């Protein structure tokens, strides 16, 4: 087997290794286009938006527990060598970096305050990361216990003083706010006036209801029970809409649209939610109602109160209490039962009076009024629940029914008194007749 070995001086073309560069340079330039650049050269319009690539250090570097000082190099000799020395040739063919160095250094000196992360960055010759503002919410969640201790010394992190949107992140991520999620009032964070961490600690008191004036008229609704010849409209306030969306009813968009007499449309629910958001009320999509739908659900508070007032007037003036009392008295006209029946009527009158007095002390909110409480909170809360379910109709209606029942008891007692008088008069006449008979016989 023959092995041919050629040295550099025995090449067929007669050119040595030293003449290689001369031969390449002597080739005609027309046959070859210009060589592509070794790096990307941005256009002049994109120069301001271009940032050079970030190269991590060639070895893992632990956080340095020291500050910037004159003896930093002597105390830490491994920092004397440039960790990016091996990457220097790569930066040579990039002339645009020289033009960007001065503006970036000036911007860094202007925007970066001296703080915790600045000395290690300067000591290593690294460019500071620009996403500190995005990392601030994660940093603050880890400072739940030490936030008050760091409040007096502001940190030098860029964007930590007033990070944009931090209040909203805290309001969403704070686990202590889970109890307020079911509220229909749209929560608005209070803007912080100071840049310390103590103002960033969010609590329940820092969320206020964004609801507008509760007495403001939201819309006007025609009555359900009025005749066509005398149609009356009732004003629905913002406070009433809030009460219909809150417990115990918790109406959804469909039922609320029916109460407000809104015509059904394809985007009716979305339009209603957008309008409620403008006044500070939150109506989530897909919400389920909490209470059963009754005929009273379709009434607004103004019409329900109007119905209760008319019902009370009719019960007081038109209820046949006297006729009912006389009829029942004739059913129990046995003289042996009169005394026991009178005792039962007096006891029923006393019980009815006690219950009527209790209902008279009811201070359930009527409309936007908030009267002072008289009853105990446990009893008043139950009466308020009943009033909210009936939209103000239930309490006055029960009082009107109690008034009609009391009138019946009074008429029954009057009927018994007449029966007692007639019975006594009849007995006295019979005794006189018997005396006359005895005298006549004698």
From Swiss-Prot:
The sequence motif named PPxY motif is recorded at 54-59
The answer on whether this UniProt entry bears the keyword Signal reads: no
The record's keywords, sorted A to Z, are: Activator, DNA-binding, Nucleus, Phosphoprotein, Transcription, Transcription regulation
What segment(s) does the record annotate as region H-S-H (helix-span-helix), dimerization? 287-417
- Annotated localization: Nucleus
Q: In which tissues is it expressed?
A: Expressed most prominently in the mitral cell layer of the developing olfactory bulb and to a lesser extent in the granule cell layer. Also expressed in skin, articular cartilage, primary chondrocytes, and chondrosarcoma cell line SW1353.
Question: Which residues does this entry mark as bearing Phosphoserine?
Answer: 246
Q: Name one GO biological process term.
A: positive regulation of transcription by RNA polymerase II
Name the Pfam families on file: TF_AP-2
Alphabetized GO MF terms? DNA binding; DNA-binding transcription activator activity, RNA polymerase II-specific; identical protein binding; RNA polymerase II cis-regulatory region sequence-specific DNA binding
**Listed GO CC annotations:** nucleus
Share what the entry says about its subunit structure, partners included: Binds DNA as a dimer. Can form homodimers or heterodimers with other AP-2 family members.
The record's comment on protein family reads: Belongs to the AP-2 family.
User: Function of this protein?
Assistant: Sequence-specific DNA-binding protein that interacts with inducible viral and cellular enhancer elements to regulate transcription of selected genes. AP-2 factors bind to the consensus sequence 5'-GCCNNNGGC-3' and activate genes involved in a large spectrum of important biological functions including proper eye, face, body wall, limb and neural tube development. They also suppress a number of genes including MCAM/MUC18, C/EBP alpha and MYC. AP-2-epsilon may play a role in the development of the CNS and in cartilage differentiation.
- Name this protein carries in UniProt: Transcription factor AP-2-epsilon
Q: Which gene encodes it?
A: Tfap2e
């Amino acid at each position: 087997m023959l092995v041919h070995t050629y040295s550099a001086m025995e090449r067929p073309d007669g050119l040595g290794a030293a003449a290689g560069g001369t031969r390449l340079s002597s080739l005609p330039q027309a046959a070859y286009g210009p060589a592509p650049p070794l790096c990307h050269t941005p256009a002049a319009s994109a120069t301001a938006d271009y940032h050079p690539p970030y190269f991590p250090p060639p070895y893992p570097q632990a956080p340095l527990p020291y500050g910037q000082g004159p003896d930093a190099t002597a105390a830490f000799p491994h920092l004397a060598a440039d960790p990016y020395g091996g990457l220097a040739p790569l930066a040579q063919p990039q002339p645009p970096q020289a033009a960007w160095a001065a503006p970036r250094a000036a911007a860094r000196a202007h925007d970066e305050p001296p703080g915790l992360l600045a000395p290690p960055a300067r000591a290593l010759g690294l460019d500071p990361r620009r996403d500190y503002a995005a990392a601030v919410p994660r940093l603050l969640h880890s400072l739940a216990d030490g936030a008050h201790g760091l409040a007096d010394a502001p940190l030098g992190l860029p964007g930590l003083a007033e990070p944009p949107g931090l209040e909203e992140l805290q309001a969403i991520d704070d686990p202590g706010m889970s109890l307020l999620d079911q509220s229909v009032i749209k929560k608005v964070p209070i803007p912080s006036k100071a840049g310390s961490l103590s103002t960033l600690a969010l609590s329940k008191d820092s969320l206020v209801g964004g609801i507008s004036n509760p007495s403001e008229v939201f819309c006007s609704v025609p009555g359900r029970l009025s005749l066509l010849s005398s149609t009356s409209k009732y004003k629905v306030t913002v406070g009433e809409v809030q009460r219909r969306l809150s417990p115990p009813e918790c109406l959804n968009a469909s039922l609320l649209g029916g109460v407000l007499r809104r015509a059904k449309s394809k985007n009716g629910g979305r339009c209603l939610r957008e309008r409620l958001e403008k006044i500070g009320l939150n109506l989530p999509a897909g919400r389920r109602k909490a209470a059963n739908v009754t005929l009273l659900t379709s009434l607004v508070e103004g019409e329900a109160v109007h119905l209760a007032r008319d019902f009370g007037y009719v019960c007081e003036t038109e209820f046949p209490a006297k006729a009912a009392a006389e009829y029942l008295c004739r059913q129990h006209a046995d003289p042996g039962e009169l005394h026991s029946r009178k005792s039962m009527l007096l006891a029923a009158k006393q019980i009815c009076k006690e219950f009527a007095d209790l209902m008279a002390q009811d201070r359930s909110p009527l409309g936007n009024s908030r009267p002072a409480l008289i009853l105990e909170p446990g009893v008043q809360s139950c009466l308020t629940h009943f009033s909210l379910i009936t939209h103000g109709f239930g309490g006055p209606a029960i009082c009107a029914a109690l008034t009609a029942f009391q009138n019946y008891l009074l008429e029954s007692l009057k009927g018994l008194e007449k029966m007692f008088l007639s019975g006594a008069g009849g007995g006295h006449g019979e005794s006189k007749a018997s005396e006359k008979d005895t005298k006549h016989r004698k």
